[in-house]
């Protein structure tokens, strides 16, 4: 994939068409550890971890200082203080995501090829159980309000809910389309992107029903999702290079932020009020609301294929995963052996 650099400052109009007014300004690619962006965000470091397997979602336990990385058939665990691999969770075939329930001392994976979720101990990383899910579990989240884990099953167009403590499946939620990422607000609501219908659905995590559907037009095929729970805003990264801002209280999209190509994850930092979009073209979009419905955004150069991210709430740094690929080696391309790395962006 090619890298495209740019800086955007845009005032976003609150219209039904979600129009924006702004201009692109040339970006200066700062050297690693340098600061060439107006926002102050830049690549702090790149750490090569190597190891086998491709990757999907990342999850950070900021309190325990651990980073969890899905690696096709296993989960790699990294110490955030030393940048060293400190553990591995095997037997997670087709793993996509990792969810954590720190108060229960448990973690959970979504195993897309096995149609299961692996339960593991957060301290020892030992596997302590397995749960059968719907077909093709992709995103997985923990909802602290209901103390339930939700897997969002792309092949089944539904979500499986199970009790985080017992591992008992408590229900299935039909979603009316193929889900992508989701997030819980901590108050009993779960919000999930539906990529096939370009919507966000609201789920009651206790009743296990979809209570609302929100169209994201003009956003198309949303993948990444992040939640500003305090202000009831849902950020959805869409395939047509915009991040929609959905006000769930108002029931409508109130703004759109232009982003880079090939987004697959989003983040929101409640400590700084900054929203992020990790783009496979090799950029991280950084956006901040400057007035109601108006955002200022900037693209920070990262690395090609760095399209998933996780946020460290302690340092406010963003972690992205990527690797090198052999040129013209087919589709999909072959990864260069032991080239897997994390890219850390911060101030």
In which residue ranges do the predicted regions lie?
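Predominantly soluble domains enriched in secretory-pathway, periplasmic, or organellar proteins
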Residues: 4, 18-20, 25-347
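Bacterial N-terminal signal peptides that target proteins for export
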Residues: 2-13
């Amino acid at each position: 994939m090619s890298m495209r650099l740019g800086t955007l400052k845009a005032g976003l109009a609150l219209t039904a068409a979600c129009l924006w007014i702004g201009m692109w300004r040339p970006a200066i690619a700062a050297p690693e550890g340098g600061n060439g962006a107006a926002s102050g965000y830049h690549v702090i470091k790149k750490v090569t971890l190597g190891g086998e397997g491709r990757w999907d979602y990342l999850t950070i336990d900021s309190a325990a200082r651990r980073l969890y990385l899905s690696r096709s058939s296993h989960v790699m665990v990294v110490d955030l203080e030393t940048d060293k691999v400190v553990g591995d969770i095997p037997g997670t075939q087709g793993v996509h995501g990792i969810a954590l329930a720190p108060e229960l001392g448990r973690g959970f994976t979504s195993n897309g090829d096995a149609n299961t979720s692996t339960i593991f101990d957060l301290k020892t990383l030992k596997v302590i159980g397995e749960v059968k899910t719907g077909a093709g579990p992709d995103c997985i989240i923990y909802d602290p309000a209901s103390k339930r884990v939700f897997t969002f099953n792309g092949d089944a167009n539904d979500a499986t809910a199970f009790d985080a403590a017992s591992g008992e499946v408590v229900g299935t939620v039909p979603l009316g389309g193929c889900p992508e990422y989701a997030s819980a607000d901590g108050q009993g609501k779960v919000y999930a992107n539906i990529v096939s219908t370009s919507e966000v659905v609201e789920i009651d995590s206790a009743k296990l029903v979809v209570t609302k559907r929100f169209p994201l037009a003009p956003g198309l095929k949303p993948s990444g999702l992040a939640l500003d729970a305090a202000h009831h805003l849902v950020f959805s990264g869409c395939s047509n290079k915009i991040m929609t801002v959905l006000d769930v209280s108002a029931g409508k999209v109130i703004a759109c932020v232009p982003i880079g190509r090939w987004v697959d994850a989003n983040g929101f930092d409640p400590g700084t009020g900054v929203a992020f979009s990790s783009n496979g073209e090799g950029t991280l979009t950084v956006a901040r609301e400057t007035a109601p419905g108006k955002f200022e955004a900037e693209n920070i150069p990262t690395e090609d294929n760095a399209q998933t991210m996780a946020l460290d709430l302690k340092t406010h740094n963003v972690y992205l995963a990527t690797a090198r690929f052999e040129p013209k080696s087919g589709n999909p391309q072959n990864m260069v052996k032991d080239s897997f790395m994390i890219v850390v962006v911060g101030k």
